[in-house]
């Protein structure tokens, strides 16, 4: 799945909303304390278990959605959580974020920030759970989720501060790991931001092990996520997931974990010209994370 790149008008508005939150917090240093963000926005937090009906019903007894008691529709939370695969949800009427307790600790941080993102974007109010006035098309839903993801990333990575620090480091996975520790976010979300906010030609991928495919692996959709910088998306719009995955397989070793390898991968731009990218892939025993950084045109001479 490709990352959806928002237009400049949406990002400018969201940057303004997030900037006000960070300013009101005194422009904190990393890592951002989400408890302080919730206190500022007067948001509460509670947990539910997606694997226990009784836990969902216990939460439902206490909540209202769009002004109506959830208890009047006792299966609403269970149905929504199950059908949509939700890991967290925002209940605006109650000023409450609900998080699935089954989600691993560090991933809960992203789920919480995503819901805060929905809360700080004013036009998301009419699309929240239970509002019968707004029925979202799949494309609109994708847009809304991308906007909340962008807001979450701008919060957790403190807007321009992350970009400035990323620029000061070498373009490799070691730098991504440094930023992961500094901002206390998952390496997956850090890689995503590192690539997506890169002003140059950068590409990232999150996939299974390139030499140990899962039972449900699809050659047509080999990547879990295909992340592109805005510059890469514009100049290399014809590059597919299959192209990236094929390149990854050329240099990766069949190791159980850690660095799987580095190598040069050739990709074709929109005019058909070949260019060389430096790729490297790390496997954390759950997913393979790949970063590709631009090196040179294929015909350029290599310094000796």
Go through each PLM region and give its residues.
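Active-site hotspot residues in diverse enzymes, especially metal/ion-binding acidic/histidine motifs
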Residues: 1-304
